[in-house]
Amino acid sequence: MADIIYGFRTIFPIPLAQTCSWNFDLIEEAASISAKESYEEGLHVTFSPMVDIVRDPRWGRVMESPGEDTLMAELFAERVIKGLQGNSEQKIPKNKIAGCVKHFAAYGAPIAGREYNAVDMSEHTLREVYLPGYLSAVKAKVKLVMTAFNTLNGVPSTGNEWLNKMILRDEFKFAGVLISDYAAVEELITHGYANGPKEAAQLALKATVDIDMKTSVFANELGAIVNNNEQMMDLLNKAVYRILSLKNDLGLFEDPYRGLKERSAENSSILCSEHKKTALMLSEESIVLLKNNGVLPLEKGKKAAIIGPYHDEKSTLGMWAIKGDINDTITLKDGINEIVGNNKNPFCRGSHLIEKETAHLLGKFEDKIPNERISNDELIEEAVNLAKDSEIVILALGESIFQSGEGGSRTEITLPKPQQKLFDAIKKLNKQIITIIYSGRPLILTDVEKHSDALIQAWFPGIMGGKALANILYGISNPSGKLSMSFPRSVGQIPIYYNELNTGRPDLPENAFYRFASRYIDESNKPLFSFGYGLSYTTYQYNSVSLNKKLIRQNSHDELIVTVEVENTGDYDGYEIVQLYIRDQFGSTARPVKVLKDFKKVFIRKGEVKTISFTITEEQLKIYQSDLSFASEPGQFDVYIGSSSEDLPLKESFELIQS
C-alpha cells in the first residue's frame, strides 16, 4: 500500500491541475500508467483518488482534489478508478492495482480551511454536493474507501456508524474494505469521542472499519472486545472476510509477489517514452492561460529574460509525489532552451523562494528549503539589471511545494514576500511581463494580474512541466485548460464557488447602489477568475442554441437534445471546452444560480463552425428535496451554454411536466 496520488515515477500534474484539462480520457490514461508502474514495483493498493470537494483554497490538500464542482468529482472518481483497476468487476488484472477513494466524508470542508478542523454542514448539502463523488467511486467498483480525519457534525468520521454503515454500506452498497486514515482510530480518543483505546476500537468496528492504519488499537483491543460478545465477533469476522476478499481479488494468494517477478530492467515501463508523452500532454492541457494582452505566443527571436525562483527549479512535482524523483524533472529553463537554443535568453533566480520566517513554520520540511547565501535584495538587483536589457520579462513565481499539501493550510494565500518584492521591482520597469505561477492551490493574484501582460497558471505540473510550459509560451501548443476552481480576488471572499444560492437579496446590476443586497461594501462578489475560465490563442464565438423540444415528462425516458454552434474566429486551431449549465427556477429547496451538467472538449480548426449536441435527461434534473428524498420536480429550467461559468451567452428554457 502506498500513496500513488498522481504518478509513481512518471509524475503527472497534481489532481487539481488534471481536472483543469477537462480531459477525463487522458486522466484515466495517467491513472493507468500509475497503476502499471506501481504493479512493476510490487505495490497492490494506492490511496487514490481523493474526491473531496473544496471551496476554500486556504486548505492545503486542495492540490489533491478535483476542485469545487460535484460533476467533476464524480467523473474524476470514476475515471481514475477505471484507470487504476481496469474494467474487471472483481479480479484486479495484470498491470492494475486496487484504488481507495478518500476521505469519507467531506474532509475538504474544514472550518476556516484549517487542516483537520471540524466539518459542520447540513445533511442536504452533504448529500447534494459532497457525497456524489464517493458514490461515483462505489459505482465504479472501487476496492477500498478511506475514512476522514475530521468530525462531521460533531462525530469523528472514523467512528461514525451513521456515515459508514448506514450510508456507505447500506445505502451505497459498498462491500469492500474500509480503512482508517493514518492513526484515525486512535485519534477518536483525542477527539474526546472515545474514552480510551478499547472504546475507540469498539466504535470503529461498529462503524464497519476493517483496517486500523498505523496504530495498534485494533491489534491490542479486539481480542478482548470480541470475547464472549457474539455481535462484535460477527463484525470482526465480516471485517476479516472483506480484507481476505481484497487479497483474493488481487490474486495475492496465488502470487504474493504479484508484479515483482515479471519485472526486469529490459521490460520495465517506468519512465518510458510513452509514459512521458502522456505526462507532457496532460501537463499542456492542465495549464491555464488566465490573461493575454497579445504578448503570447512568443517569437523565438525575441529576447526574453527568464527570472524567478522557479526559472530552473526541479522541485515542481508537488508535495505528495511520494515515489517521484525531482531529477526526472524538465525545468522551465530546460524547456525554453530546447526550443530557442542554449544561451539565447538570460536567466536568473531573482529572489528567494520564501522568507526565513515562513521556512521555520514548515516543520520537518524546513531543511528542504535551500539555504540562502545571497540576500534577496542582491538577487532582485541582478534581476532588474537583466530585465532592463531584455525586450520582455518572464517571471516564474509561486509558492513552495511545502506550503501546500497536507498540513499546508495558509491564512494568506498570496505570493511569498521575497517574490512579491521582485514582482514590484520588475513592474516599475514598464516592460512587458509574462507571469507564470506554480502552486498547489488558487492564489490571490489580484495585483499580479493587474500588472502582468500575460498570466499563466502552471500548478505543480509534473516531470514534463518545463517542456509543456515552453511549448505554450512559444505557440507549439495552444492552451486549452480551464479552471476547476474559482480564484478569489481577496481572502475575505473565501469560500467562493460558482454554484451558490441566489439569496433573497441578490447582488444585481440594477441594484448596484442599493445597500441592502447580498454583497461586500469593499469588494466584488465575483472571483478574479471564475470556474470554467481559461483563454486560448484563438477566439471562439457561440452562435446559436436550440432545443429539440420544450417539454419533457417525468418517468418517460424523454431526452431533450441541446444543439449549439461554436465558431473558431481566431488564427489558430484549438480545443474549446463547451460548457452546459442548468438552473432550476423553482424547487422545494432553494436552488443554485447554475449547476454544471455537461461539457464537451471539442477540436475546432480556425474558421470552422462546429455543431455540438448535449442530451438532458430527467436524471440530471433530480435534487434532494426538503425531506432528503432524491427526485425530480416539475417546473421550469434554464439552459446556459458558454465558455465558463461567468461567460454564458446562449440561453434556452424548457419545462419538466408530470406524466
Where on the chain are the PLM-derived regions?
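Short beta-alpha junctions and helix-cap segments that line functional grooves
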Residues: 625-627
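Surface-exposed, short loops/turns at beta-strand junctions within beta-sandwich domains
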Residues: 630-632
